[in-house]
Amino acid sequence: MNINLLTDAPKHNLALMKISAYHKAMDDNVYLNWVGMFDKTYASWLYDFTMKGIASVEGGPAVDNSILPPEIESMKPDYTLYNLDFSLGYTFRPCYRGCLFCKVPKMNHPDKEHHSIWEFHDPKFNKICLLNNNTFFDPRWKETFEEIWDARLAVREHGFDLRLIDEERADALRKTRFEGDIHYAWDRMEDETKILAGLKIVPQGRVYVLVGYDTTEEEDLYRCQKIIDLKHNPYIMPFNQSKREKRFKRFIDSFMWRKYRNIKEAWKDYKV
């Protein structure tokens, strides 16, 4: 059979990588984002604006909450589909925060179990990307770190929850080799006490700052200043993509504020 896989994912798509592995195991020919006639076409869509209804089987966050059949979900990803040089997968899917601005609660994936990295890691790689939505909610999070240390892997990740940070978790982060920045987040002002306590003990990293949701400009400036004072770098996440939010993001990304005594003074002078 000739199988075509379609997606609007800009980098990689784990579901399609597993579908590819499944069909290649049956000696099918697999193509990615080709145009033509095929025996079967799968599509996984991330964005609402993408054209739908052009594949035999469609899924993904922009379509529905459907999941892969067990026989496909259990496959190791086909890393040749995107010519990746790192492993990709989940050791723990859930995040129990239920934040209204986040898509994770809406997806509501039924898999709540811990998984070993060896369910998806290819030992030929020395890097691994964890797609976990909240690693430290996993009661067995230590096992994940121990497997990574034993395999001497460099880690890419989607962020660690500062509200769950204690000395033990912070020490695990310090012992881990990361590729690029470690990522954290400060979305809500009501979490300030726990966020600041976490930022004081974790390794230096990049902190996602949600703006335009339920915070004021004054609170956005305040959060960025606190993050900088604790030797981390803020990274603005515009919620509504408004002109003001995008301008504030450009301001923080420009690092021109480093020339000033504080963020507030720099923002007053920012003209772009």
Task: State the predicted function of each range.
Residues 1-55:
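A short, structured N-terminal alpha-helical element that caps or precedes a catalytic domain
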Residues 1-4, 85, 98, 127:
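Residues that mark the start of a beta-strand
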Residues 15, 84-119:
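Canonical Radical SAM [4Fe-4S] cluster-binding loop centered on the CxxxCxxC motif
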Residues 211-215, 235-272:
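Flexible glycine/acidic-rich beta-alpha junction loops that bind and position SAM and/or redox cofactors
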Residues 24, 149, 228-229:
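Anion (oxyanion) recognition and catalysis
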Residues 42-46, 103-199, 204-213, 233-238:
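Core AdoMet radical
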Residues 214-230:
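Catalytic cores of alpha/beta
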Residues 56-81:
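Ser/Thr/Gly-rich flexible loops in soluble cytosolic domains mediating phosphotransfer, phosphorylation
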